[in-house]
Amino acid sequence: MSRRILNIVILFLCSFLTSCLGVFYIDLGNHYAWIESREVVKITEEKDNALYYDEIIYPQVLNYNYDDQYIIVYQVYDGSDYYDISAKQDKAEKDSLYAQFDKIKEIKYCYWIIDKETDQVIGPLRKDDFDRRCQELHIEI
């Protein structure tokens, strides 16, 4: 009986300690980050093991690279319900997101470019458009 109680206490302790770790993310510079849910976000605030952010590129971000000025991203549409956004957004935002999500669903394998200095997000792009834009912007990441 005491062994069982010890196991329960250890399990509870492990759960408690790991729940306080916060959100895992990789800093991409200028407050941009890749977070564990496979999104690229712009961090607005970080305090008390909580992360507040604006979503920039939705899941599934499978690959990314960055330098001092740009972040380049490879995203795959996974067919999830994540892209069925709710009707809670205002009309301008909802229409904009629907148009972007429709394009993501159509392309499926999307590329993005984020200019960290101007906060400009270019995408979703097909591979050939992405390569052309990288040449135009002299991106060599």
Roles of regions detected by a PLM:
Residues I8-L13, Y64, S86-K88, I107, ...:
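Compositionally biased, intrinsically disordered low-complexity segments
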Residues T18-Y70, Y74-V76, Y82-K88:
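N-terminal export/targeting and maturation segments
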Residues K105-I141:
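C-terminal partner/receptor-binding element of secreted or periplasmic proteins
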Residues A92-E93, I141:
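Short, surface-exposed, polar/charged, turn-prone segments marking secondary-structure boundaries
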Residues G79-A92, I107-W112:
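Structural motif
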